[in-house]
Design a protein with these regions (language model features):
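Signature of N-terminal electron-transfer/Fe-S-associated modules in redox systems
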Residues: 1-142
Length: 142
């Protein structure tokens, strides 16, 4: 960051502010599987605290720490834009949605074993429409 500040002729604090504000910048090493748990209001109301509990149990008690095998790390983040599928988490570039504590633990164990499970809804949702919403073609999707 000091190099970037010097290169851009700006104060170091300005570079630091950007690097610590955006979750896509990491100030310490992350695992092969980087888990971001959404804890904004919609996800929290629907149980994201259970996802955090699962991460603490299966990966590391502290955010940002690597798992014992070094493959996984996790953090809490603000809205990931999939509120209708709450609670959810992003693993690398993929969204895992409609989660509960048990499903989250299964996903985390699969990552620790380097055999990731399929991303998407874990409740059988076919799209991200609200529950019982009918598409313009008349099909109901849950």
């Amino acid at each position: 960051m000091k190099y970037i500040a010097k290169y851009l002729s700006m104060p170091y604090i300005n570079v630091y502010e950007v690097a610590t504000f955006y979750t896509m910048y990491n100030l310490s090493p992350v695992g092969k599987y980087f888990i971001q748990v959404c804890t904004t209001s919609p996800c929290l109301i629907r149980g994201s605290d259970k996802l955090v509990k699962a991460c603490k149990e299966k990966i590391s008690n502290e955010m940002g720490e690597l798992s014992k095998n070094g493959k996984c790390s996790w953090i809490e983040v603000e809205c990931l834009g999939a509120c209708v599928s709450a609670p959810m988490m992003q693993i690398n570039e993929d969204y895992y949605e409609d989660l509960d504590e048990t499903k989250t633990k299964e996903i985390l164990v699969s990552l620790i074993n380097d055999k990731p499970l399929k991303p998407g809804s874990y409740r059988g949702r076919k799209n991200t429409s609200p529950e019982k919403f009918k598409n313009i073609d008349g099909d109901k999707h849950a």
